Amino acid sequence: MNRIFKMVIVATCLAALTSFVNYKPFRLFVLGDSISLQYGADLGKYLGDGFIIERKTGDSIAFKNLDIPVGSNGGDSRMVLKYLKSKVNDPSFNPDLFVLNCGLHDVKKDPTTGKIAVEEADYRSNLEQIYKLISQKKIPMMWVRTTGIIDSIHRRNKGFNRFNKDIQRYNNIADEVFTSHQVPEIDLYAFTEAQGDNRFVDHAHYTPEVRKLQAAYIAGSIRLWKQTLNFKTK
C-alpha cells in the first residue's frame, strides 16, 4: 500500500470520526395543552432521526383527565408564563427550538357566570411576556395556533363552556403578537378543521387518525423551518 493511499484512508477515517463526534441532535422543547400531548405521541416518528423532543414532565397525571391542566399539560397562558418564569432559570433549558401553544384553557367559560378563564388583555400580555422570556434566552420559537371546536358538539360537556368564536378571537390576538415579533406560526386550527366534522372523539379531542395527521403536519413544518434556517446560515 503506497503512502498516498494510506494518507487518503487516514483522512477519510478522521473525517468520518469528526462528523460522528460533532453530530448534535436537534433539540425541541414542546409545550402545549392536551391536544399537544396527544399528537406528541407520534411527533417524534414523523420528525425522524436527528431530533430530540423534550417536554414538561407528568404525562401519567395529565392523561387522567385531559380537561384538567396538570402535569405535562401546559394549561392556559397564565400557567405557561408561570412555568417558564421558573424554567428559564434552568441552565439545561436551551433547546434549538421552542414550540408553544396555549389558548383552549384560556377561553373556558363558567357555565353559570359566563366568566372567561383568561381575559383578552391578559392573554395578550401573557403571550408578550412569554415571548420576552424566550427571546432573552435567544431561543428560536414557533407558535401553534389553537385548534377549534364545533359548538353543538362541545355543548355536550357540562363541566364548562367553550365557544369557537372565542378561539378564533384569541387566535387573532396570538397572530398579532407573534407576527409583530416575526415568530413563525403553524396553523393547526385550519389544518385540523379541514379534517371534517367527524374528527372529534369527544368535545375537543381528536381521533387517532387525526392526531397522526396533526403530528405529520407539525413535523413537516418544523423540518421545513430547520431546512430554511440551515440554508440561511450557509
PLM regions: where:
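Conserved SGNH/GDSL esterase-like catalytic core that processes O-acyl groups on lipids
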Residues: Y23-S125
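Bacterial N-terminal signal peptides that target proteins for export
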Residues: M1-V8
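Generic detector of low-complexity/intrinsically disordered segments
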Residues: A16-S19, D49, F231
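Alpha-helical cap/lid subdomain in secreted, periplasmic
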Residues: R78-T233
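Bacterial Sec-dependent signal peptides at the C-terminal "C-region" and cleavage site
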Residues: V8-P25
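Hydrophobic alpha-helical membrane context
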Residues: A15-T18, K45, R199, S221
